[in-house]
Amino acid sequence: MFEAKEKVCVSAHRGGRNHGIENTLTAFRNVMAMGVDMIETDVRMTADGFLVLMHDETVDRTTDGTGRVQDLTLAEVQKLNAAVHSDKPMAPEAPPLLKDLLELAREYPDVMLNIEFKDYPTEGNEEFAYTCAAAICDMLVEYGVEKRTWINSFSGKILEFVYKKWGERFHYHGFYPWFILGDMELDPECFVDVACMQHRYQNADGEVIKYEEPMCPQEWFQPLLDKGIMPLMAPSLQEYPKYDKAFSWGSCIVNTDEPEDMLAHLREMGLHT
């Protein structure tokens, strides 16, 4: 079972998504300094095998460039400005590498890492995705951060690939209901210890569809807790009363786009120091 040092663990989603500098070193430094418990970020691999922190398949939304990450070289990525949309004036900043975050994390040994694997083993992309996943894990092991790292993916195939090779050296973050993860050989309840709660259903065609109301029903929480799986609350809830309700149902971890505001709210509630 996931255990928080605080009554509620605050994870900074992409380092704090709402300020135009998501997944940058500036964002990560800011939220680590303010006292978050966990950094959530996204990793993709460039055409020449470097691990870059980028959420989207392309660089178009978050930088001044265009193109798929996996089609660009590191040299091309490093010419981009990932702070171009910042809500405050700041110097240009290239998208960081995973190793840059891991170097920064050495300064904050108590901060947990939530690493989302964004290259998926879709048809024709299997080799690339598994190569990327292995490279990420090898680097995490190299930096000795396994025990404070959660392997996170919407792809059940990626999660079980990592688990089969590295086992319990890492922690694992899945998505609930489990059908979101797609086809898997393993039962995620056998190794996943954090589940991001998504209010979704699967129609007769197997398509996963979101409910308009992002809050999952209370009856979803206790069965997970009984199996040692901690429900994680996603940024989509947006309203503090909904988060507070989830905390009362047993969740003790929140992934937020506004970590400073969330920390202030939790401190006011006596749920964080």
Labelled PLM ranges:
Residues 1-273:
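Phosphate-group recognition and catalysis centered on beta-loop-alpha active-site segments
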